[in-house]
């Protein structure tokens, strides 16, 4: 029953107090099971049907889908349950204790983005879900901060096709309709070690990598010349060489060299297209030195994302907020949810506070966020 639902600030406090860190390092990684249980119980109290799904390939992580209403279409409100690890010693407050001070709510996940679920629950307190004319779905995902495994799995397996979706990442309540993607690769070259006094008896992996880097930088120039999206502050795909390591001694021919790089593609560029461009760029090295160069993913790739600017969702949200949609350079789960329905990224708090010590959400976002959630539910589920 709704009268069992705690006050807004107590919901927020309980979410922050329930650790759900995701990390590639196993020692830091945590299950989100306790947080999912909290959310599931609250949405059941509001009259929602709740389904909890294990996410394959994760360390005991779960998605939750809460649904009410019948028929096709409707609205999906989505967010992730996990946070990044916190920097021990750099926080001046307990990351897992919600603390209010000087118009700010402090705690790990206040902005990015456990708080969004507190806003949804509080807004639904005054909504009679039995009278919805179209379905309302609430999706809570796992591992957004690492592999985005939760959103990927949901998009791959669900039969739902809502009319539209909103992901409540911290955008300072400025609607976002597009962002770049992210691809990160390891380029590895296997040479042949030997004594440096006789270079002909070995194959120097550093020299081969030098050749490969030249072709990769040509690809970077080609991407900049060929692809443009003027709405972005950096209106072309970027390519960065971020890490390199090779060899072990000055008097030894280098046997192995490894380069880490990333590409941030524009919306509309497919992952297959980018992989093809990279492989084509490195083809001369492979032809000259067959079998010595490999390209491997460092992290699962994220495509670029764009919601059609003329979609009803964009028009409605722009009218409600009195603000035009924007494009951003960071990544979200939107590319995966967008495969199901037109999607906007829109939520309280600033991205500038995400992943920072003493993360906070300004209390000035409380009233307009609650009003916005209520308005979009009324528009897309009652009309």
Swiss-Prot record:
Gene3D superfamilies: 3.30.70.360, Zn peptidases (3.40.630.10). It catalyses: N(2)-acetyl-L-ornithine + H2O = L-ornithine + acetate. InterPro entries: AcOrn-deacetyl, ArgE/DapE_CS, Bact_exopeptidase_dim_dom, Peptidase_M20, Peptidase_M20_dimer, Peptidase_M20A. Pathway: Amino-acid biosynthesis; L-arginine biosynthesis; L-ornithine from N(2)-acetyl-L-ornithine (linear): step 1/1. The keyword Transport does not apply. One of its GO terms (cellular component) is cytoplasm. GO terms for molecular function: acetylornithine deacetylase activity; zinc ion binding. Its cofactor is Zn(2+); Co(2+); glutathione. Its main location: cytoplasm. It comes from the Bacteria. It is found in: Cytoplasm. Zn(2+) 1 binds at residues 80, 112, 169. Zn(2+) 2 binds at residues 112, 145, 355. The active site is at residues 82, 144. One of its GO terms (biological process) is L-arginine biosynthetic process. Its EC number is 3.5.1.16. It is an enzyme of class 3 (hydrolase). Keywords: Amino-acid biosynthesis, Arginine biosynthesis, Cobalt, Cytoplasm, Hydrolase, Metal-binding, Zinc. Binds 2 Zn(2+) or Co(2+) ions per subunit. Catalyzes the hydrolysis of the amide bond of N(2)-acetylated L-amino acids. Cleaves the acetyl group from N-acetyl-L-ornithine to form L-ornithine, an intermediate in L-arginine biosynthesis pathway, and a branchpoint in the synthesis of polyamines. Belongs to the peptidase M20A family. ArgE subfamily. Homodimer. This is Acetylornithine deacetylase. It comes from Escherichia coli O139:H28 (strain E24377A / ETEC).
């Amino acid at each position: 029953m709704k009268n069992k639902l705690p006050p807004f600030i107590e919901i927020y406090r309980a979410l922050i107090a329930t650790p759900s860190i995701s990390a590639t390092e196993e020692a830091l990684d945590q299950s989100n099971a306790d947080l999912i249980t909290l959310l599931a119980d609250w949405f059941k109290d509001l009259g929602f049907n709740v389904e909890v799904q294990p996410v394959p390939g994760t360390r005991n992580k779960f998605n939750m889908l809460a649904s009410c209403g019948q028929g096709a279409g409707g609205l999906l409100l989505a967010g992730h349950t996990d946070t990044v690890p916190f920097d021990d010693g750099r926080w001046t407050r307990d990351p897992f204790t919600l603390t209010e001070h000087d118009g700010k709510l402090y705690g790990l996940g206040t902005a990015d983005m456990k708080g969004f679920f507190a806003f949804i629950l509080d807004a639904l307190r005054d909504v009679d879900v039995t009278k919805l004319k179209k379905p309302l779905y609430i999706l809570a995902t796992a591992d957004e901060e690492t592999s985005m495994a939760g959103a990927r799995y949901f998009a791959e397996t669900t039969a739902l096709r809502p009319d539209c979706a909103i992901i409540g990442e911290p955008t300072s309540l400025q609607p976002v309709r597009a962002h770049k993607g992210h691809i990160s690769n390891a380029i590895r070259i296997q040479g042949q070690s030997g004594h440096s006094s006789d270079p002909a008896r070995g194959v120097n992996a550093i020299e081969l990598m030098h050749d490969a880097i030249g072709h990769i930088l040509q690809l970077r120039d080609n991407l900049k010349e060929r692809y443009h999206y003027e709405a972005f502050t950096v209106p072309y795909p970027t390519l960065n060489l971020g890490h390199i390591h090779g060899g072990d001694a000055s008097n030894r021919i280098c046997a192995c060299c490894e380069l880490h790089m990333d590409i941030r593609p524009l919306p509309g560029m497919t992952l297959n297209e980018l992989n093809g461009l990279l492989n084509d760029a490195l083809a001369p090295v492979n032809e000259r030195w067959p079998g010595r160069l490999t390209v491997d993913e460092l992290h699962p790739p994220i495509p670029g994302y764009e919601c059609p600017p003329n979609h009803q969702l964009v028009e409605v949200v722009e009218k409600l907020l009195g603000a035009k949609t924007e494009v951003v350079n960071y990544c979200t789960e939107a590319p995966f949810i967008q495969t199901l329905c037109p999607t906007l990224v829109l939520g309280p708090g600033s991205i500038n506070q995400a992943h920072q010590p003493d993360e906070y959400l300004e209390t000035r976002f409380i009233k307009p966020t609650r009003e916005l959630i209520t308005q979009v539910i009324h528009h897309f589920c009652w009309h």
